[in-house]
A protein has these predicted regions:
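ATP/NTP-dependent adenylation/nucleotidyl-transfer catalytic domains that generate, transfer
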Residues: 1-172
């Protein structure tokens, strides 16, 4: 855009893509009466790895209280199980290539979440200590995490509060 002339591409352009998608989904919602369901999980929402009025749009957030590592576990579990009296097909419903693919916001070529975030196993363990166990930074470090990484996650957690306050409600 002319307004961006002379500036380097950054998350501004990425957010336009996410917001355009959100705009289209909300228009479909208005037209059909269906509800847009937010795709954010607890890991992403905790640290603000989301776009206001983009992937955060929606009327309900099914994965709001589910860390990303648990999302993968749930996908594997559902592919292996179909509880009695539950609607839906037998067998795998989440394609393995989706589960195996490195997580990405898909807002620029070859982008991976780990370009911006710690690996989810580390991020989720730190977030569980800070969020669920109400541990201090020193206590989380004592669990075996790198102090610089814990501090980075802590700063991200604090900085994302304004986004979490605008997120759709969800399962708790």
């Amino acid at each position: 855009a002319e307004s961006f002339a002379g500036t380097e591409a950054d998350t501004t352009e990425e957010n336009i893509q996410a917001r355009s998608r959100g705009l289209a989904l909300m228009a479909l919602s208005n037209k059909t009466g269906a509800m847009v369901v937010s795709t954010g999980n607890k890991s992403e929402m905790s640290v603000g790895y989301s776009t206001l009025y983009g992937d955060m749009c929606g009327g309900y957030s099914v994965l709001k209280d589910v860390y990303k590592t648990k999302v993968f576990q749930l996908c594997h579990w559902r592919n292996a199980n179909r509880p009695a009296h539950v609607l839906g097909p037998d067998g795998a419903v989440v394609p393995e290539n989706i589960i195996a693919k490195p997580p990405t916001a898909e807002l620029k070529p070859d982008q991976k979440d780990e370009d911006s975030l710690p690996p989810y196993d580390q991020l989720d363990a730190i977030l569980e200590g800070l969020n669920e166990k109400d541990l201090s930074i020193d206590d989380v470090v004592a669990e075996g995490h790198d102090r610089a990484l814990v501090l980075r996650v802590w700063r991200m957690l604090l900085g994302a509060e304004y986004k979490r306050r605008q997120a759709p409600p969800g399962v708790k």
